[in-house]
From Swiss-Prot:
Lineage: Eukaryota, Cryptophyceae, Pyrenomonadales, Pyrenomonadaceae, Rhodomonas
GO CC annotations, alphabetized: chloroplast thylakoid membrane; phycobilisome
Described function: Light-harvesting photosynthetic tetrapyrrole chromophore-protein from the phycobiliprotein complex.
Region of interest called Disordered, as start-end residue ranges on this chain: 1-44
SUPFAM superfamilies per the UniProt record, alphabetical: Non-globular alpha+beta subunits of globular proteins (SSF56568)
Name of the protein: Phycoerythrin alpha-1 chain
Pfam families: Phycoerythr_ab (PF02972)
Cross-referenced InterPro entries: Globular_prot_asu/bsu, Phycoerythr-like_a_sf, Phycoerythr_a
Top-rank taxon: Eukaryota
Modified residues (5-hydroxylysine): K4
Post-translational modification note: Contains one covalently linked 15,16-dihydrobiliverdin chromophore.
UniProt entry keywords in alphabetical sequence: Bile pigment, Chloroplast, Chromophore, Electron transport, Hydroxylation, Membrane, Photosynthesis, Plastid, Thylakoid, Transport
Source species: Rhodomonas sp. (strain CS 24)
Length: 44
């Protein structure tokens, strides 16, 4: 029998490259394009 409780993860991709907002919210080392991208995976 098929397991009806099986669920797939929710995947959200954030791509903030090219944003015109001034970079005031972060401190630390020099940012690269990798600092403006993120993948979020969650089990709902």
């Amino acid at each position: 029998a098929m397991d009806k409780s099986a669920k797939a993860p929710q995947i959200t991709i954030f791509d903030h490259r090219g944003c015109s907002r001034a970079p005031k919210s972060e401190t630390g080392g020099t940012a690269t394009k990798d600092d403006q991208m993120m993948v979020k995976v969650s089990q709902v």
